Amino acid sequence: MKLCGFEVGLDKPFFLIAGPCVIESEQMALDTAGELKAITGELGIPFIYKSSFDKANRSSGKSFRGLGMEKGLEILATVKREIGVPVLTDIHEIDEIKPVAAVVDVLQTPAFLCRQTDFIRACAQSGKPVNIKKGQFLAPHDMKNVIDKARDAARDAGLPDDVFMACERGVSFGYNNLVSDMRSLAIMRETGAPVVFDATHSVQLPGGQGTSSGGQREFVPVLSRAAVATGIAGLFMETHPDPNKAMSDGPNAVPLSRMKELLAVLRDLDALTKRAGFLEDNFGWPACA
């Protein structure tokens, strides 16, 4: 699959989707995107900038949601133009798709909406690549149905059907907790779509602070190493210059100052993993046949 001018897949270096959870200001967006571009450029990692204009599923109705679609898209367009990087943002309603697709390079669907057929079909018919997040309630093999819906919709519209990604972001484990089953990354390869691992939402503690979600950012390096060692096409990671002051998802965001050292480790591990190959491709039962 070709994405934003670069090839993605298990035979290619992983690409990175990264940025603050929500757009807080134009200057912060420009500064963060510029820093990430410099880091990924030095490390040779393909990069897509991510930030949201609206967080429609906050734990509390009193929490900051964002700057709104009009202002948010203006800022994303500025980042794209001035920093020279492709941009991604998420949409939450069918009516948002057309104006957002006119600005960004990649669309992203919220995990909660992965089973909404009309929504997935509309996103697939936007003409843009779509990063489709797996719901916290969904088995990994069920993502094949979701990807198939998107492909069918694209073909119905006469559009390419190989522009969709399947993204793992953890699965609910009791109340206010998520776990990451690394088997899901291998299982989701059966969709035929590039698999992306969301390393920061996977350490989220949904609603864990009562009116907001908590998180355990100290486990981002742990899970991201595990995912890269399993084998992924892409890595999603939210970052912030000062996570403790972030207006959304600070507890699970990676400090921007730590991104370079983490990505350097992951780049080297990714190269080793892909050079060694994937034994699981022909490791099924019976093992001694």
Swiss-Prot record:
Q: Name one Pfam family in it.
A: DAHP_synth_1
Q: Where does it reside? A: Cytoplasm
Cellular component GO terms, alphabetical = cytoplasm
**Catalytic reaction(s) noted:** D-arabinose 5-phosphate + phosphoenolpyruvate + H2O = 3-deoxy-alpha-D-manno-2-octulosonate-8-phosphate + phosphate
Report which superkingdom the organism of origin falls in: Bacteria
Pathway listed:
Carbohydrate biosynthesis; 3-deoxy-D-manno-octulosonate biosynthesis; 3-deoxy-D-manno-octulosonate from D-ribulose 5-phosphate: step 2/3; Bacterial outer membrane biogenesis; lipopolysaccharide biosynthesis
* Entry EC number(s): 2.5.1.55
Q: Which InterPro entries match?
A: Aldolase_TIM, DAHP1/KDSA, KDO8P_synthase
Q: Name one GO molecular function term.
A: 3-deoxy-8-phosphooctulonate synthase activity
- Keyword list, A-Z: Cytoplasm, Lipopolysaccharide biosynthesis, Transferase
* Presence of the UniProt keyword Cytoplasm in the record: yes
The answer to whether the entry has keyword Cytoplasm is yes
Q: Which family does it belong to?
A: Belongs to the KdsA family.
- In Swiss-Prot or TrEMBL terms, this protein is called 2-dehydro-3-deoxyphosphooctonate aldolase
